[in-house]
């Protein structure tokens, strides 16, 4: 029934928010095949046209803690994360907890809205390891020992931010 159909019942609710946060579990990939109902695996991607649903819902903030953001790399040997981040940027969406490398993935998303200073941080503890960003590859921020998150929360609170931390 079209790419916007899944948002039919929640559209007005989502659009009414000052900030709309969505956890998007998968990367966009231009070669993403149409879903096959007989496929029994757990390798996921989204056709770039599906960004229209996030636009329609008014998505502002995209969480990338998901463990399927690197599925395209595992199956097709293509790193689709940079393309995905460019697509978010083109659609004026900001993201956190994922990036082109581990430094980028661990960077907090800082937003000031209605007089509030918000800092979004997140990480993936679930894995598998191929889902995690490294010094040389894209993916979700690995939780590791959580010390880095504790340090960031302390630093950000000292700067007047309210940290919002998400985990998968």
Question: What is each stretch, according to the model?
Answer:
Residues 1-168:
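Acidic, metal/ion-coordinating pockets
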């Amino acid at each position: 029934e079209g790419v916007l159909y899944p948002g039919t019942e929640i559209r007005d609710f989502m659009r009414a928010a000052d900030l709309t946060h969505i956890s998007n579990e998968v990367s966009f990939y231009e070669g993403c095949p149409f879903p096959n109902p007989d496929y029994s695996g757990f390798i996921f991607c989204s056709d770039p046209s599906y960004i229209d649903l996030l636009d329609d819902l008014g998505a502002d903030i995209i969480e990338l803690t998901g463990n399927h953001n690197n599925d395209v790399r595992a199956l097709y040997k293509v790193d689709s994360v940079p393309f995905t981040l460019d697509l978010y940027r083109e659609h004026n969406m900001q993201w956190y907890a994922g990036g082109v490398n581990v430094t980028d993935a661990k960077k907090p998303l800082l937003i000031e809205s209605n007089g509030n200073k918000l800092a979004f941080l997140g990480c993936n503890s679930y894995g598998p390891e191929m889902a995690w960003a490294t010094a040389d590859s894209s993916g979700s921020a690995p939780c590791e020992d959580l010390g880095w998150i504790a340090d960031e929360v302390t630093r950000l609170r000292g700067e007047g931010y309210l940290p919002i931390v998400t985990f998968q």
